[in-house]
Structure formats: C-alpha cells, structure tokens
Amino acid sequence: MNAPSVRAPLAERALSERVRAVPPSGIRKFFDILATMEDVISLGVGEPDFDTPRHIVEAGVESLREGRTHYTSNYGTVELRRALARHLLGRYGVEYDPATELLITVGASEAVDLALRATCDPGDEVILHEPSYVAYVPAIVFAGGRAVHVPTRFEDDFALDPAAVEAAITPRTKALFLGYPCNPTGAVLTPAIQDALAEIAVRHDLLVYSDEIYDRLAYGSYTHRAFSSLPGMRERTILMGGFSKAYAMTGWRVGWLAAPAGILEGIVKVHQYGIMSAPTIAQDAALVALVEGEADVERMRAEYDRRRRLVVDGFNEMGLETFEPRGAFYAFPRITSTGLDAETFARRLLEEEHVAVVPGGAFGPSGEGHVRACYATSYEQLEEALVRIGRFVGRCRAEAAARP
C-alpha cells in the first residue's frame, strides 16, 4: 500500500504562482522597524508633509453634508471628467472625450493596475526602465506579464537610452512602461528622448503606459509634456495620473486614466467589477482641487524646490554624489564611498541615527549603491536629517579606513 503523499500546508498552496513570485516590498520592512522607534526623521515615504489645502477639504465636507454618499458612474462624476478634459487640453494640448476616454480611479495606483490587467496576456513582455517605482513590476506580474528591464545609470543622469529600449524588443513585447518624472531618481525624459521613444513605439506597434503622477512637480528649466500629446501617441498611450502628490491628497485616493475609447471600454470592465467607482466625496474634493488649486500646487512646488536644493547640496558636500533631480520629490545619492551596500547603509542609519531612507535596490538592480531620500518633509527636519546622515557617513568612512 502506497504511503499518502505529503502536501504542503494549505496556506502555502492557497496562494497563486503570481503572488508567490512577487517578493514583499523592499520598503515595508524598514517602516516596520521605524514604527517601533522614537525621534525618527523619515525620508522614506513618498508623501507630501502638507495637509490637503483647506478649501479642498471643505469641498469634501460639503459633499457629505449634501448627502453625496452614493455611487457615481463607473467612469466617475461627469463634472470631474469634464474638468479633467479641460485641464489636459489646456496644459498639454491633448484632447479627450470626457464621456468615453476618461476614467476616475482610486488613486493612480489603481489606474496602473487596471491598465495592465486589461491589456496584458500571459507572457506579454513590458519594457520598463529601472530604477523605477516599486509597484510597477508586481503590477506587471499580477497581470500575467513579464517585466523586461532597461537599466539607467547615475553616470548618464539616469537618462533612458532609446537605443537600449529598442534592443530589448522581442516578438513578445507588448508595451513600453514609462514612469516620469521618475520615482526614485527624479530623472525626466528630455524632448529628444521622448520623441525617439515615440518613434520606436510606432515603428514596433507598441502600447505605451505612461504614469505621470509627478507631472506638476518639475523644477528648473524642465517643462513636462504628456506622452500622449506627442505625434502618433494619443492612439497608443494609456495616460495615468492623480491628485495625491501635487495637491497633497494621498489619503483621498483619487486618480485618473485617459485612453482611446476602444481601450478605455475594456479597462472600465475591470474597474466596474472590482471597484465600482471612486469615492464620491473624494471626487468632489478633487474637482475643487483641479479647478481652484493652481496656487496651492505652485506654493508647494516652490517649497519642494527649496528643499531639493538643500538636500542635493547637503549630500554632495558630505561626499555622497547626488544627481540633481528635475522632477518628483526624491534624491537618490550614491553611497558606495561609505563602504556599505545600500541595505546595510539604510538599516544602520535608521538604528544609529534614527533617519529612515530606502535602499536603492528596492527599485531595481541598478539602484544598488544608492538610497532614496524623500524631501517632502519640513525644511527644518531635512536640516537635522542631513546633520545626522553626515555624522553617520563620517563614522562609516572612519571604519572603512581602519580596516586592514
């Protein structure tokens, strides 16, 4: 009589291969440690330190008072979609039909998830620059796709090389995924690179996913262009964005997605069976943000710019070479001169000086040797964080010099 086969515990067998293939977030474990500590300055979470502007909050409160506590259309409120259409036309010169080409989502994260799940078939390859936001690869995997990385390097200002993108294309390539301005590097796409990527997308008949959540946070001479506004790109681009970063509305969870009607119709299928609609009161607040919040955006952007200069100068002065970010609100200093790898650097900095940063490897293999520091916290806290980091870097170098 054959012995019964030994099966793995149900908890292990219950999870799908896709879920098991994705490791836990490289960021989360540091925040689990951080939660147990006091006097910590966190440069880890990518969240504005500003509260949502008062008039936007009041719009949400008024929405509640008016009893707007029911579902909206799957697509979102008509008023918000119309305002978004005007915004995209006025700022980027790209026209969308608010009835059939715009979708309001639960944050830009849902937009990314929807876009991928609605368009990826098993085994489809999606070309993705890296370092890049930690959620992109899992979203591709959960959709059944395969991420194909194109590394970017500090020595090249983390610029995406169109020739490298084209070299990565195979018969299985479905799409190109762009997340610019870039989290974690702060890099942007120059007009020349954008144009070259657009030509590649047309030449190889690729879909383009473009997450532009940081579009309003650009510095210096850089001016953002929506990828769908480029020649030939509107019909093949799924454009995504949201209100969290520019308007300090992370907790409201409102994003958006713009795509040709034929593509959006399929995306809405995924949305309506999973989410139904974004929260009504949050959409009402987002409408006021979009229509009346320009001064708020500029006020916060100017302060981020002031902090950006402080942090970049501070890192460079302590010998941590740092690319000058042109967008978003992150610095990505190179820490190899300390003799530590990025994970050890981040762990020890948290334990010894109570400053939280994120190891660069969490954003892809070419992020190793760097850490991400978010400067969306107060100027005074950033000044203190730089003092602590400088002290820690000095100790690390002294330790390295003392080794035989």
Task: Give short role names for the model-derived ranges.
Residues 30, 63-87, 91-92:
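N-terminal Rossmann-like NAD(P)+-binding subdomain of aldehyde/semialdehyde dehydrogenases
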Residues 1-15, 20-23, 33-37, 41, ...:
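PLP-dependent class I/II
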